[in-house]
Amino acid sequence: HLDFRRQRQMCIRDSIDTPLLEELFPKGGILKQVHWESHNGRTRLPAHLNPPHTESDIRGKAGITFGRQIGAYPILIGAEYLIPLETTSDVVVTGHGARSITGVECSMNYDTITEKQLSAIPGIGSKSAWKLIGERVKLKRKDSTEVFPDIQSWFSTAGLSWQEDFAPYFSA
C-alpha cells in the first residue's frame, strides 16, 4: 500500500508538477526581487541572521542559497552558490525540479564574478569558468586596476565563444 502511494506521488511529480513549473517559469525567464533566506538547506536557521551569512563577501562562494519572491505560496528558488541572506536580486531561471526551480542572478559584474557563479550559468561549465578566471587573474597580475574592455573580449582571450544567451547574467 505504501509503495503504491509513493509510486503515485512520484508519477504526479514527473507528469504534472515538473511540466507545470516548466510552463509557469520557463528557462531564461527572469524572476524579480527574489529574497534570499537560507544557506545549504531549505530550513532557515537563527544563525542565518548573523555574519557571515549576511555579509557581502560571501557572494559567489561554494554552497547553495535558497530564496523566494514575496507571495502567498511562492516557489522555492535555489542558486548553486552563496548569496548574502536578507538581500534581494533578480534571477534568470536555469532549471526545474519537481517542486522548485534553479536560478542564477542577473547583471553580475564580469570583473568580480566567481568561478562558482560562472559555472552555474548554462553553457559555461567548470572548465570554461576556470579559463575565464585564469585570464582575469593574468590581466590583474600585470596591473590590478586593468579590466577587459568588454565581456566578449574576456571570452575571446580565454578561447571561448560568446553567446547572446549569456547576456542577462552580466552587467554592461
Regions found by a protein language model. Give the residues of each.
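ATP/adenylate-binding site constellation spanning eukaryotic-like Ser/Thr protein kinases
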Residues: 5, 72, 115
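C-terminal extensions
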Residues: 109-120, 134, 143-172
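A short structural micro-motif
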Residues: 138-139
